[in-house]
UniProtKB/Swiss-Prot annotation:
It comes from Shewanella pealeana (strain ATCC 700345 / ANG-SQ1). The keyword Protein biosynthesis does not apply. This is Glycosyl hydrolase family 109 protein. Binds 1 NAD(+) per subunit. The NAD(+) cannot dissociate. The lineage of its organism: Bacteria, Pseudomonadati, Pseudomonadota, Gammaproteobacteria, Alteromonadales. GO terms for molecular function: hydrolase activity, acting on glycosyl bonds; nucleotide binding.
Amino acid sequence: MKLNRRHFLKTAGLSAAGILTSQLPLSSAEAVPKKPAAGPSVMGLVVPKMDTVRVGFIGVGQRGSGHVKHFCHLDGVEIKAICDTDPQVLDESIQFVTTQGLPKPAQYTGSEQAYKDLLNRDDIDIVIISTPWEWHAPMAINTMESGKHAFVEVPLALTVDECWQIVDTAERTQKNCMMMENVNYGRDELMVLNMVRQGLFGELLHGEAAYIHELRWQMKEIDSKTGSWRTYWHTKRNGNLYPTHGLGPVSQYMNINRGDRFDYLTSMSSPALGRGLYAKREFPADHERNQLDYINGDINTSLIKTVKGRTIMVQHDTTTPRPYSRHNLIQGTNGVFAGFPNRIAIEQAGSDSYHKWDMDMAKWYAKYDHPLWLQMGQEAERNGGHGGMDFLMLWRMVYCLRNSEPLDQDVYDGTAWSVVNILSQESVNNRSNSVNFPDFTRGAWKTGKPLGIIGT
C-alpha cells in the first residue's frame, strides 16, 4: 500500500477512521479494563463451516501481493475484491489473478478510505490486511464491525488501547481477528513445537526470541515501499518495534494464553547510532534522511517473566551489520534447542553428551518433523514464501475456516505478542523498571486448551 512520509506524519498518531489513540502507550495499570467483557470469549472460537472462503485484500504492496499469489493456488477460495491506494500495485495484483484463469476481482482505490467500500460488500467472508502498521488496528476493527473475519499482518496494534479495542470488537462481534504470524508455520518451529509437546526437553524454563535483520537499506525507499514509512518509526519510539516473529513460536512452545501468560517485562536499549551513521554515509548532508533524529536503540533486549515463573529474552535489531537470526531457543530441564544455526543438546542417562551441540539435524527431522509439515511441506516449499511458511499459514487458515475448526492463533495471541512493542518502550523510558502485561484474555488463559499437534 503506497503511503509516504506525508501520510506517515499525518496518521502515525491519529486514525483517519477516528479510532486510533496517541502513540504514547498507556501505563499497565491504566490498561486494565474497568468494564465487563464486550461479549463471550473468542478463545477457541469456532465459526460456521465455509464451503468456499470468499476473500478481500486491503493492501497489495510488497507483502500483500504475495498473499494474493498464494491465494490463487489454494483450493476452496474466491478472490472477490482488492484495495490499494497505489493504482500500479493494485493493477499488478488484479492482472496476476486473471492470468491464473480466475475471475477478475473488483478493485478499490482513489483514497485512504476506499477500503471501507470493500468492507461494505456482502460477498466477502474474510479480509487480509497488509498495510503500514498504523492502519492495522482501525482496519481490523472496521472489518469485524462489517461482519467479516480479520486477518492482519504484524504487528496487530500499536497502543494498549488499540489492543483492547480489537479484543472488545472481536468479542462483541464474535469474529476472528488473527495476526498472521507466519514464522509459527516454519518447518523448524513446527518441529520444535512437536518436540516440546512430546516432552523431549522436560519442563520448560526459558526461551529466547529475536528479530535480528539488517534493514538499513530500506532507508533508501523514499517515496514508496516499506522503507518509505517504516523508517520513521525509528524516530518515534525506543523499544522493540517488531517482537512477534521470534516471540510467536516461543509463546506457543510455552502455552502462553493456554495455561500460562506473560506477567511482566523489563527492557533496555543500546545507543541509537547506526541509522544516523548510515544516513551520513549514504545520503547528501541536506537529504531528509539526515534531518531525522533516530531515537530507537540499535539493539533492544527485553526480558519477560510468565505467571508460571518462566523467562523469555526478546531482542530487536534491524540496524547493525550482522547475520539474520530469530534465536528460537527453548530450554527445559532435560535439554535445549537453539536455532540459527539449528542445534540441540539433550541429557541422556549415563552420558554427558549435552556438553556439546548436536548439529546433525537429519535424525531429529526424521523423528520429530511436524505432521502438518510432513503432509504439506513439499507443496508449501514449491509455492514459496519464506521457505514455505507463508503458504502453509494461509493454507491452514483456509483449512480451519472450511472445516469449522478454531484458528491456531487468536486475538489474544496477537495482542499479547504485539503489546511488547508498547511495554518495552515504557520500560526503556523508565530506567528499565518492570511493566505489567494486560491480561487480554480476562482470565481465560487459565482454562485455555494448549495448541495440539495437528495435521490435515
